[in-house]
Amino acid sequence: MTVAVGQKARRSLTLSAEHVATYARLTGDYNPLHFDAAFAAKTKFKTLVVQGGLTTGLLHALVALDLPGPGTVFLSQHWKFTAPVYVGDTITADAEVVSVHATKPVCRLRITVTRQTGETVLKIGRAHV
């Protein structure tokens, strides 16, 4: 797939309790922040939060299926979680190509993930794919 600077893509996902449970079964991430409401209530989050891997997983789908597209993998990324994600949130990943290597099939993306309120929950300062 040919990509150009300025090209954009978007992908959304509404997260459910089943997503959280399935992710835990697959990865073993049974952190009480995701399953124990009494435990979570005593933390800065005050309620159950979704595993970060579900948020970053949306990025992998975006890169592999949308921009640049099939066959693409992350070579490197640097992200920062800026807010928690909760069950019921709809998260949206937006990617934009900011540079394309002149001689290799490599590009740099700017990616942000927001929730339905418009609040940013994850920022990627740089991602090479």
Regions found by a protein language model. Give the residues of each.
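Catalytic strand-loop segment that frames the active site of acyl-thioester-processing enzymes
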Residues: M1-V50
